[in-house]
């Protein structure tokens, strides 16, 4: 039971990483955003490997680790597509910060998009693909 909560909390780490990247972008010029996206995927791969070692089940690890990403994706899509604006509170702010490290990659994968939603979805799919790659490689 404890490992389930631990893996779920590991899945929440992009909130902190997004906040750190937000601070870097506000205080430093020339932050290499695409490089940070690649680092985030490498970190997510490490978390995927760690979660697999704790559960010994690909699907259980995938679900536990990516549940926060799924919930956050739903939150940002509801805000953008449903309400047409992001909430002006901590939930609205932190739901955007979760995917901030991967948004540069998401935008590169969706150059045709005129809204942020496809970039969020692409970022989410990159996280899932990264986890699946690690599970197949180690499984």
Q: What is the role of each PLM region?
A:
Residues 38-47, 119-132:
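Hydrophobic cores of alpha-helical transmembrane segments in multi-pass inner/ER membrane proteins
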Residues 89-107:
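Short hydrophobic, aromatic-rich alpha-helical segments embedded in or entering the lipid bilayer
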Residues 63-88:
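Hydrophobic alpha-helical membrane-insertion segments
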């Amino acid at each position: 039971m404890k490992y389930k909560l631990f893996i779920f909390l590991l899945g929440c780490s992009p909130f902190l990483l997004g906040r750190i990247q937000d601070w870097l972008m506000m205080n430093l010029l020339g932050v290499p955003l695409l490089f940070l996206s690649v680092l985030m995927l490498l970190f997510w791969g490490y978390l995927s490997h760690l979660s697999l070692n704790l559960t010994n089940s690909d699907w259980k690890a995938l679900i536990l680790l990516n549940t926060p990403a799924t919930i956050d994706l739903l939150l940002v899509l509801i805000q953008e597509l449903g309400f047409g604006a992001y909430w002006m509170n901590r939930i609205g702010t932190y739901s955007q910060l979760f995917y901030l490290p991967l948004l540069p990659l998401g935008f590169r994968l969706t150059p045709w998009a005129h809204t942020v939603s496809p970039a969020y979805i692409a970022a989410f799919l990159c996280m899932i693909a990264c986890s699946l790659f690690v599970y197949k490689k180690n499984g």
